[in-house]
Amino acid sequence: KDIEKSLNALSQIVALENPTIKEFPEKKMKCAVVEMNGIALEFLEDNSEDGFLAKFNRKKGDAIHHFCLLSDDMEKDVAALRQKGIPMLDLEPRIGLRGKKIAFTAPDALRGISIELSEP
């Protein structure tokens, strides 16, 4: 809900350099990426009334929405998941906030948490 509060809470646990918070006015979203020991954590704030994160936050509060796995071949990996019967929100890869191809599984694929596939 509040990207600054989330980053501040994390900084109480681990040393963080002030990450850049990027604004995407056309999507009514903010995004910050924190990299630690080879892991990237992406924090999102949805300031719309009907965006997917706004709906998620109303339903579940502040919680992990998804985690991301990197893919060197998005089309192949999306097709493989679909062939295994994994429900997908994105039947084909699309361009995400960072300008990379992404695709999400449906939340019910992993007990309420989506998996995002993304180009590196």
For the regions a protein language model found, what residue spans apply to each?
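N-terminal beta-strand motif that seeds the catalytic metal site of vicinal oxygen chelate
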Residues: 1-8, 62-71
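A cross-kingdom feature marking solvent-exposed beta-strand/loop segments within repeated
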Residues: 11-29, 47-65, 84-102
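Vicinal oxygen chelate
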Residues: 22, 32-35, 41-42, 69, ...
